Amino acid sequence: RCVSETAPGPGNPDQAGNCLKIVKDLFNKIPILGVCLGHQIIGQVFGAKIVNAKKLMHGKTSKILHNKIGIFKGLKNNLVGTRYHSLIIDRKTLNKDFIITAKTKDNVIMGIMHKNYNVHGVQFHPESISTKEGMKLIKNFLKYK
């Protein structure tokens, strides 16, 4: 089983080198988990606009509300996620082939999942020590079919 993780920033998807091309070329061939900038890259590849967040979130934590599906299955709701970003996926432009799997209380998209392919994105950092359930989320991705 092959796994790809598009790494976090800095910058925006247009400055991400070959990451846009990698997602375009491989989304239907291998599982992809996009973290932070990787999440935004997935959104942009599928037509979403990436916009400035109303609030900068560099090194801050937020409670993440999720729908307990996909890579969030079995995780506590209101999990604390560590955030390092100033850009977000514009909810109105998210491709309808994606499900919003997680958000903040102020409705910022924190997780997406493609309906037909093993493609997931999270705006927060599951690998951060401050994201207590982060390793469970990553394990869920590794096991997800």
Predicted regions and their residues:
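Histidine-centered divalent metal-coordination motifs
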Residues: 36, 85, 125
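Conserved hydrophobic/aromatic beta-strand scaffold that supports enzyme active sites
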Residues: 61-63, 109-111, 121
